[in-house]
UniProtKB/Swiss-Prot annotation:
Family to which this protein belongs: Belongs to the TRAFAC class TrmE-Era-EngA-EngB-Septin-like GTPase superfamily. EngB GTPase family.
Co-factor(s): Mg(2+)
Binding site for Mg(2+): 40, 62
Record-annotated EngB-type G domain positions: 25-197
Keyword entries, A-Z: Cell cycle, Cell division, GTP-binding, Magnesium, Metal-binding, Nucleotide-binding, Septation
Origin species: Wolbachia sp. subsp. Drosophila simulans (strain wRi)
Record-annotated membrane-spanning stretches: none
Gene: engB
InterPro entries the record matches: G_ENGB_dom, GTP-bd, GTP-bd_ribosome_bio_YsxC, P-loop_NTPase
The protein, known as: Probable GTP-binding protein EngB
Length: 197
């Protein structure tokens, strides 16, 4: 099954401006979060690949919206540029932030946004700002806690409680992920992909 998933995923396009966004012919789920929170690693884990999505140790390397086609374009995974730290210049940052905003608000085939939060640092102000923006624009989202293997269960529980209290919406699910904790990946993958049906 894992090999089948990998063979049915292809990188199709990296959009650096509004005009270059691909057509809206397939349902999409998008992954957002602070720079270096693990979006590309999560996508690789979901599709059982080590290199489909480029992973960098330097924050702010993804500067375009990357689209991955699943099962002959039955649906797509979308890797959004990280918010926060970036090596890009001010004008370039403004350009891709405008691109992200346009994509999230205008994309008719967008089914769900998964907001990734680093469990080591918890919910930061910049995460709150982004989530508040999603809420104000009526954009459906869930939360994904990354790097859960690097914190204690007590600390993880405190982070989850803090997020639940701040969002205060029982319809927003909180998922737990780590590239080193793979035994629950099938269940999580099914949970993510159900939004594309």
């Amino acid at each position: 099954m894992a090999k089948q998933i990998t063979s049915n995923c292809n990188f199709i396009f990296g959009a650096s401006d509004i005009k270059s966004l691909p057509n809206e012919s397939a349902p999409e789920i998008a992954f957002a979060g602070r720079s270096n929170v693990g979006k590309s690693s999560l996508i690789n884990l979901l599709i059982n690949s080590k290199k489909a999505a480029r992973v960098s140790s330097k924050p702010g390397c993804t500067r375009q919206i990357n689209f991955y086609s699943m099962y002959n374009d039955k649906f797509r995974l979308v890797d959004l540029p990280g918010y926060g730290y970036s090596h890009a210049g001010k004008e370039e940052i403004i350009q891709y932030l405008n691109l992200i905003e346009y994509y999230l608000i205008q994309r008719r085939n967008l089914r769900r946004v998964f907001v990734l939060i680093d469990s080591k640092v918890g919910l930061k102000e910049i995460d709150k700002d982004f989530i508040y923006w999603l809420i104000c624009n009526n954009i459906n989202f869930n939360v994904v806690l990354t790097k859960i293997d690097k914190v204690s269960q007590k600390s993880l529980g405190a982070v989850i409680e803090d997020i639940q209290r701040w969002i205060n919406n029982e319809n927003v699910s909180i998922h737990q992920m780590s590239i080193r904790v793979k035994h629950k990946i099938t269940k999580v993958r099914d949970e993510f992909f159900k939004f594309t049906r």
